[in-house]
């Protein structure tokens, strides 16, 4: 009997959140170990489908770093990173597009369909969704040039959400691969955290949720108990300046700051290694990970 009462408590706890977010759009940046483990994949997909069935509009922007790295290794193409961003030459760009658009995107769509949902996969090149231009990275070294060329790495100029709004209206879960175009035939690899943030802004999303391989933002990266459960954008900026936030967490934090400044209600950086972390973050009082607010 107790286990049934426990299930009832879970449903009752979720009810006010279901009411609160009914009809709202939530953008999910899907990446990290949750894309590698079959068990976690299944949990994420089921979370997305459940969200849709209770009236929330999830929009997925996915990464694919581990898959890209594996394919590049197979082809003996070296990977280099600057400030957490992959340097992308022409050969790397071909692999990035093949993996993100041709493999990862289609797999996610197939899993959503298998779980009973409806999904459409697209990249930023489709229907003029993401316009981009070349991105330069600030040189992390004190000597040499101030900015470094990252190759075919893009910075977003504009997001046209029309195709996403149409898909949402028709009951589909849009699944977006982070590749964009400059409108003149050149394509760019774009950091998925940046794409998720810009899509969230364009859709006026209530939340942006970022799945990571850490519990959230840590004050000491060697201590998972040093989790910062809530933070303002001013506090996050200070942590970046102090070097507490670094590496791959920098683009996540900077994208979160940008999204909140331009109207996204809150950004949640959560532990994608926990099964059903999406549901725990949205539908429970405690939540998981770090919540960033204005």
From Swiss-Prot:
Keywords: Amino-acid biosynthesis, Arginine biosynthesis, ATP-binding, Cytoplasm, Kinase, Nucleotide-binding, Transferase. GO terms for cellular component: cytoplasm. GO terms for molecular function: acetylglutamate kinase activity; ATP binding. Its EC number is 2.7.2.8. It catalyses: N-acetyl-L-glutamate + ATP = N-acetyl-L-glutamyl 5-phosphate + ADP. It is found in: Cytoplasm. Pfam families: AA_kinase. The keyword Heme does not apply. The record marks 29, 252 as: Transition state stabilizer. It is an enzyme of class 2 (transferase). Substrate binds at residues 64-65, 86, 189. InterPro entries: AceGlu_kinase-like_sf (IPR036393), AcgluKinase_fam (IPR004662), ArgB (IPR037528), Asp/Glu/Uridylate_kinase (IPR001048), Glu/AcGlu_kinase (IPR001057), NAGK-C (IPR041727). GO terms for biological process: arginine biosynthetic process via ornithine; L-arginine biosynthetic process. Pathway: Amino-acid biosynthesis; L-arginine biosynthesis; N(2)-acetyl-L-ornithine from L-glutamate: step 2/4. The keyword Transit peptide does not apply. PANTHER family: N-ACETYLGLUTAMATE SYNTHASE, N-ACETYLGLUTAMATE SYNTHASE, MITOCHONDRIAL. Belongs to the acetylglutamate kinase family. ArgB subfamily. HAMAP family: ArgB. NCBIfam families: argB (TIGR00761). Catalyzes the ATP-dependent phosphorylation of N-acetyl-L-glutamate. This is Acetylglutamate kinase. It comes from Carboxydothermus hydrogenoformans (strain ATCC BAA-161 / DSM 6008 / Z-2901). The lineage of its organism: Bacteria, Bacillati, Bacillota, Clostridia, Thermoanaerobacterales.
